[in-house]
Each structure stands twice: as structure tokens, then as C-alpha cells.
Design a protein with these regions (language model features):
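Bacterial N-terminal signal peptides
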Residues: 6-16
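Hydrophobic small-molecule pocket/channel-lining residues, especially in calycin-type beta-barrels
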Residues: 20-179
Length: 179
């Protein structure tokens, strides 16, 4: 009688064991971006309002590897007709989950934004988090794509319907500066 139950019990035990990431080590996923870049940025002025007004900026992005490659700092400074934007981003690699967390400095609050968590697959990075915009809860998607040795593209989109639809609100195209 017990011999017929043993495989079922074993299966239950196997399924309850903790699962660890089996994917590739992504610690070097951002190595392509280390250095200085010319940045062309387009920003939707009023996201999730139905507005279609975009503003454009030009400037530089500098990416510095820190903590032996387990982290990097991104410094953005761009200017346009709408003024100047300065940004700072901290990216940290988690070797256990094999994912990156991306946090952005909020100049108004002096705090880091909630981290966007994700990874690169097939040459494309996707990172997600939850945030608030004008008092409403939203989802944020950050995508890094079109990666070559001399250029890359960054997009940010918001969703206020649980991820059913996304509105693109930030497009940055970087071109490497020869140093």
C-alpha cells in the first residue's frame, strides 16, 4: 500500500524545495554601456493624460562601472527648449536571482525611486516596477534595445490598467563618444 504512495510523496517534496535561478550569469549585461554617450532624448510632457506633446533634449550620458562590475552609475545631463534635465541611476546586480535592479534619483524628494527589476534576454533588457503618478498607482516598464557597439535605445512606458496597455513616454537614443 505505501509503495504506491511513495512516488506521490516524493513529487510533493521535490515541488516544495526552493527554486534558484538556473539562467546565465548576467553580471556583465551592462558592460556594453560603460563610457560616454551622446544622448538624444524625447519625453512625453504629460504621461497618461491623452497628451501627445513631446519635448526633445540633447546632451550626454556617462556610465561608470563600480563594485567590480556588480553595479554601475549612470549620469545624464541633457538640455532642450523645455530646460535642462539631470538624472542619476544606480544599477545593482543580484547574483542569486541573476537580475538587475535599476533605481533612479528623484531630485524633488531626494530619494531613489522604487527599483525596476529585470534582465536581458536575446539582446534586450526589460525591467518592471510599480510607482505612483499624480496619486495613482501605475506600472513602469523600462526597455533597453537596439544594442550595438556604438549605439543603443532606451524606452520607458507607463500602464495604469495593470499592464494591459502601455503608453511610451521616454525615448533616449545614445551614440558612443570616442574617448
Amino acid at each position: 500500500m505505501f509503495t504506491k504512495l511513495t512516488p506521490v510523496i516524493f513529487l510533493v517534496c521535490v515541488c516544495s524545495w526552493p527554486v534558484h535561478a538556473q539562467g546565465r550569469d548576467g553580471q556583465h549585461d551592462f558592460d556594453f554601456e560603460i563610457g560616454t554617450w551622446k544622448t538624444h532624448l524625447k519625453r512625453l510632457v504629460k504621461p497618461l493624460t491623452g497628451s501627445t506633446t513631446w519635448v526633445e533634449y540633447e546632451g550626454t550620458t556617462r556610465v561608470t562601472k563600480v563594485m567590480d562590475g556588480r553595479a554601475n552609475l549612470v549620469e545624464l545631463k541633457v538640455s532642450g527648449t523645455a530646460g535642462t534635465l539631470e538624472g542619476l541611476s544606480l544599477r545593482l546586480y543580484n547574483p542569486e536571482s541573476r537580475q538587475w535592479s535599476l533605481s533612479f534619483a528623484n531630485i524633488k524628494s531626494g530619494m531613489l525611486t522604487p527599483a525596476a527589476i529585470g534582465e536581458f534576454k536575446s539582446g534586450r533588457g526589460e525591467f518592471y516596477n510599480q510607482d505612483t503618478l499624480n496619486g495613482r498607482s501605475i506600472l513602469v516598464r523600462f526597455v533597453i534595445s537596439d544594442i550595438t557597439p556604438t549605439s543603443c535605445r532606451f524606452e520607458q512606458s507607463f500602464s495604469d490598467d495593470g499592464g494591459k496597455t502601455w503608453e511610451l513616454n521616454w525615448i533616449a537614443v545614445d551614440t558612443r563618444v570616442k574617448e
